[in-house]
């Protein structure tokens, strides 16, 4: 492969990984477990979400994910930012992303704003990039709840682990 062809392939791989991560976050927001599952490798997987847990089995992760999110009162948005992606070999890559997360839990009247970053490893499987390892590092958490008179009350502030679904 020529130098130009290699550079083009590298850019196409980076773009494919960006689209993969966007599909993953969109599937999370839509609570589409099948679409989330399609974003991950079929074996040798690690999902490490710190205070939420570590998983090497995608189905175990999806079971908890659906328990936490699959209710009409749970409305969330994942925003991935500032990707740094490195193609480490023909079928291996790594990346780091900033992530901002907003959640409104209408049943408990809680709003949550979280930020942090992901560190990922990717592997090409059957010609398609997949997430092999993902680690989320929480750097800030702000949780507010509406009180009886409609004012917002601060529940958590800082890098305190916690979820609006637990409030």
Task: Label every PLM stretch briefly.
Residues 1-26, 30, 34-38:
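Short, low-complexity N-terminal intrinsically disordered segments enriched in polar/charged residues
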Residues 12, 53-56, 110:
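A structural signal for alpha-helical segments
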Residues 15, 51, 59, 140, ...:
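Solvent-exposed, flexible loop/coil residues
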Residues 19, 56, 117:
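Short, well-structured alpha-helical interface segments that form or flank functional binding sites
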């Amino acid at each position: 492969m020529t130098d130009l062809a290699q550079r083009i392939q590298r850019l196409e791989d980076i773009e494919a990984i960006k689209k993969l991560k966007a599909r993953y976050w969109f599937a999370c927001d839509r609570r589409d477990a099948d679409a989330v599952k399609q974003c991950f490798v079929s074996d040798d997987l690690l999902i490490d979400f710190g205070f939420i847990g570590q998983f090497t089995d995608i189905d175990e992760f999806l079971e908890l994910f659906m328990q936490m999110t699959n209710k009409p009162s749970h409305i969330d948005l994942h925003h991935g930012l500032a990707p740094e992606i490195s193609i480490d070999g023909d079928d291996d890559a790594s990346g780091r992303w900033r992530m901002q997360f907003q959640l409104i839990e209408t049943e408990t009247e809680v709003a949550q704003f979280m930020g942090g970053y992901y560190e990922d490893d990717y592997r090409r499987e059957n010609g398609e990039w997949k997430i092999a390892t993902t680690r989320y590092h929480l750097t800030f958490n702000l949780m507010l709840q509406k009180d009886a008179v409609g004012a917002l009350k601060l529940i958590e502030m800082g890098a305190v682990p916690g979820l609006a679904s637990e409030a």
